Amino acid sequence: MFPHEEKLIKERLGREPNEVEKAMLEVMWSEHASYKSSRKWLKLLPTENEHVILGPGEDAGVVKFDDNTAIVVGIESHNHPSAVEPYGGAATGVGGIVRDILCMGARPIALLDPIRFGPLGKERNRYLFEYVVKGIADYGNRIGVPTVGGETEFDESLDNYTLVNVACIGLMRPEELVHSYVEESGLLLVLVGNKTGRDGIHGVTFASEELSENAEEEDRSAVQIPDPFTEKLLIEATLEAVHTGKVKALKDLGGGGLTCASSEMAGKKGFGAVIYADRVPQREPNMNPMEIMISESQERMLFAVRKEDLNEITKIFEKYDLEWTVVGETIEEPRYIVYWNDEKIADLPIDLLADVPIIEWEAKSYDIEKDVQTPEISIEEALLEVLSSPNIVSKAWIWQQYDHEVQGRTVLKPGLDATVLKINDEHGLAFVSDGNPSYSHLNPYHGAMSAVAEVVRNLASVGARPLALVDNLNFASPERPEVYWSFIETIKGLADAAKAFGLAYVSGNVSFYNEVGKKPIKPTPVVAGLGKVKLENITTMDFKDKGDLIAVVGTTKKELGGSELYRIFGINKGIAPRVDLEREKQNVEGILKAIELKLVKAVHDVSKGGLAIALIEMAISGNKGFEVDIEKVPAEGGLSPLEVLFSESHGRFLISFEEKNLEKIKAIFDEFAVIGRVAEEMLIFKHENKEVINSDLRQVKALYNSLPSILGE
């Protein structure tokens, strides 16, 4: 809390807050809990369209899938905790987002894990990577919620740090929606789940400031302890309680603990709450009321129920062997009152906890984009280097640790353009996340647009029409003028792109102060998207049959700024790829039409690594080769063969299809060219009638599957 905020609190309260009140206010006025540096700008994001049932403002968003089915979706970050204690930090990140979905009344059915680390050449970064993956795997597997996708990236700006974002979706009938706020006084507040300990105390405060170089030792107590077995019981008990129709409000205890959950639940509609802190079951001896009120111990839920329904609801908790306690009640007067052994120890206007003034920091623009000469590297050398980059290689080592098929809904598995989950006998839900901090570093506006565009292309590539988006915005300190400017530009880019596609953001998260030892991370907006697909139309990236034609949709430009090629060869400048929204929409609609008309056998969007990597991914996925002519790729004039292959221009797809469908497909697209054919086993790139690359599929597979050897396994 800043000095001017402490002064304002004293003025509004008319006195100094006591120790307990001050601790609660520090939690609620933290950046992590209040969004005081971002709230103004988040209002620019579109939050409504025909699919949205419930937009931002509660624990998760709700999207209409059909008349009988709603999808609940949310995304959260657990960056600081995972950088300090990667296993526990990542595991509790999973637990927290699962409870966010659960407390809307939905059964969690799938997770995505967009995760980022420093270069794997350093032992500390490998340690963070391996234990974050293990934390996600262990927790998700034990609660029976599959991790079905995500993205994994390594970047120099994340040295000794990690970004752990987790998205979750849940399934429910629309009439089962439970809100996170009460609409009447006299309700009992029932705390259910784990006992309260000292873990996670000041967790949100710790997440609202930069980490020091010694954070691993200094801040370990701020990281919560995971208990997936209790979480599994909480999932089943909560859903059973919700199905009685007698749960009036529901919140999980996440950041800010009991203070945050109970004050938000009571205060949103102008009610107050009385809390009896001494009734809270304690895991550790001699806990004081301040510790109890702000502890962030995991696997705890807060239910609001009427007195006459208490017995019915608590019998459900007892059936699952979950401890429960009535810790308070809602009151008519808008105050937040805490008792300890019959002594009143805190008494605040409830809006003082939630009504945190906006902070608008200085914003200073920067311009580091600069066109540069692409180095003269042989295509063969470039391909070897890019294909074996940790950012490009197969991430099977990660997702093979996840039980991605538990619950039996997974139709398309990890490693493709998007995962697809079966929702009913006719339709599936596509789910994917994307972000590229290298683009955002060069141009935060266009970097943000690119994340949205890639999500839409990924969804279209599997045959899905986009429904809604969620966003997770990872930034360094907003007190840095350049960082705050990049955040504002990011919001503008996210807004413009979503509006162009007719999409809304239904939930999201902002994570500031991501830096270690005063080293800021790159701007890292992550966007996750949902799409609806007919099961019979699901399309995959793998080449199917020898002799099929291969074509490119879209134009390739000299847009290598932030590309994997430039990164590998140490080029930090260049022009970041631009999103031509009209062209992007046309090509997406064209792809969806071609899929619906059953004209194409394989579709893959072109993104990181450019055309060269996209072709190789299609070949490896289908266990086929190809022969393509670089000169036939639709490209702006003056591009070298190297630039054509490794540019990361947006709006592009690769497709394969039977030759008999060529004329019908050509009629759909403006920017389209056949560049080659699917072959048996060889991967051949030609230029000026010469083979510039002739490689065996087995050699390429060995490079593409080299992550275990990079990790020293």
Swiss-Prot record:
Binding site for ATP: Y35, D471, G508
Amino acids binding Mg(2+) 2: D100, D252
Keyword annotations of the record: ATP-binding, Cytoplasm, Ligase, Magnesium, Metal-binding, Nucleotide-binding, Purine biosynthesis
A GO cellular component entry from the record: cytoplasm
Residues where substrate binds: S77, H78, N79, H80, R99, Q224, E296, S297, Q298, S511
Catalytic residues of the enzyme: H32, H78 (proton acceptor)
Quaternary structure and partners: Monomer. Part of the FGAM synthase complex composed of 1 PurL, 1 PurQ and 2 PurS subunits.
Protein name: Phosphoribosylformylglycinamidine synthase subunit PurL
Species, as recorded: Thermococcus sibiricus (strain DSM 12597 / MM 739)
